[in-house]
Amino acid sequence: MRLAVVSPFVDRRHGTERALAELLERLARNYNCKIHLYSQRVEDLSVQVPVRFSAGNTGGVYWHKVPSIPGPHLFQFLFWFHLNRFYRWMDKSFRGASFDLVLSPGINCSDANIVIVHALFHRLRELSKETTSVSEAGFLRRWHRGAYYGFLSRLEDRIYSNPEVSLAAVSPRTAQLLEKYFRRQDVPVIPNAVDPLQFSPVLRLARRAQARALRQFLDDELVLLLIGNDWANKGLPTVLKALTELSDMRVRLLVVGDDDPAPWRELARKLGVADRCVWESPCADILNAYAAADVYVSPSREDSFGMPVAEGMACGLPVITSACAGIAAFLRDGVDGLVLEDPLDTKTLAERLRTLCGQPGLRARMGCAAADASCKWTWDRNAAAVWRLLQRASSD
């Protein structure tokens, strides 16, 4: 199968892009799929530079680099949205390109045959109206985010409401939202996955001492971990407020992600927990962060799946998430994870953290159950489900 894939970037430091990298590797390797990847940036994925288009059936990933521009996200997206389609039109018109299908992880083009839905901007737009993040307190930033979410919501209306476009959701929650907003009742659930060769209790424990020493965490300190690129959406305000109720306990918080730490440091200072927080930018070696932690906590306000939660589970960490995270549908509350019904419920989060802090045996049992539960989320199974979706779409 000759497949055009459209994504602004691919790497292994962001949830959607990591999932795409794992998928493309397996479609090329396991199903001999010839993938033409139209993207502005590609990292940590083995790709070939296309010299010419041919009718051969050799599987592989061929990167067609699409230029990018600096500036606000909305302008960057508009440029990307139109240019990637122009590049594909040029390749088909003048270079002999031919694609059986066009696949997109989310809203990236108007002509995708299949869209794997990782985030819904209708829902994110609703959340942005309900609360204001400390990282976007300025009027211009709020206006820009509102305009950006509004534009993508209109594109979702146009694309996701079209029954000719095959959709897949990464969680039952996302499938329910697609039905709510677009009346789509034909959406299969294809959950994301975890690579056990990268994330496991054995690998985490082997690096624990070094990872904690690097950050000067003491042996008697319980370290909470939160990973994400939108800390407000991942529930950081709730976690910081919960820390204020654990002042009698030796608890630290490690926050990792591509967000602006300055306003969050200020919030932590106002809450009196600044000395308990460590802020880090994302890196390719994300296992190092899991190795330093004792509990993964992310009471997300909205999360289509929750890759860091799944990776934390695979590492054998007890996890706390919210019912607003897609991964919650796969958890047994109190067995292989803890689920907050309300992501803003600071009191309940503090109580659950206090319970985990005081019961190392419970942490161990829950972490072991979490690791066992994560074993069923494999990238090979994910790729097989997507391949079946591709086959159905190509035969229609």
What are these regions (language model features)?
Residues 173, 193:
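Carbohydrate-associated surface elements
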Residues 139, 144-168:
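Membrane-proximal helix-turn-helix segments that form the acceptor-binding/catalytic region
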Residues 318-321, 331:
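Short hydrophobic beta-strand element within catalytic cores of glycosyltransferases
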